[in-house]
Amino acid sequence: LRKEGDSPLVTLTSATRLRPQDFKTGTRIVLQYIPESGNQYESGPVRLYAAMNVQGSEVLEGTAASTDNWASHGMMIYSVNRTGEFLNIFGQGKYSTKPDFKLYIDSSTLDAEYPEVHMVFRDDNQLMSSSHIVYGSFDISSVWERPTCKGIHFYSSGINAGGYIPIMKADNPDIEPSDPDVDITI
């Protein structure tokens, strides 16, 4: 795991074994654990309390036309962050027995400095009054590693007024630190 962005990889070990029929090698998962050292984001043994599979795949290429204008059922976004080559999404959506949770790169922006990445979440509307926590982890390396990419613009119907969340590369020359001597009091 990584703490954030391109931070060093951390390896966790546990005496608790996960059942291979529930968790396949290479599958992204969420863990609930306590580090035995008491220090988060350090390699070492942990006490594992729970593990859950996470939805996700590689980012797919698409267009507004091919995705019904990025049509998505409502999902409240709690957080979006990048860890290495993965974009991780945490939110709440309607319970679904067959959720369709995908991340698309708008193919018309593939070579842009800030390609547009769209989250599409569709439920089967079986239990309309129930909601549940949703985790997704998507491999965005095919976009992130492009030479023209300085970051991405993440779009979702769960973001106010059709806005986006910018996710920038750390070495992005467009990022300038604020001047601490400038008063911006309103």
Tell me the role of every PLM-derived stretch.
Residues 1-186:
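First exposed extracellular module after export/assembly in secreted or surface-exposed proteins
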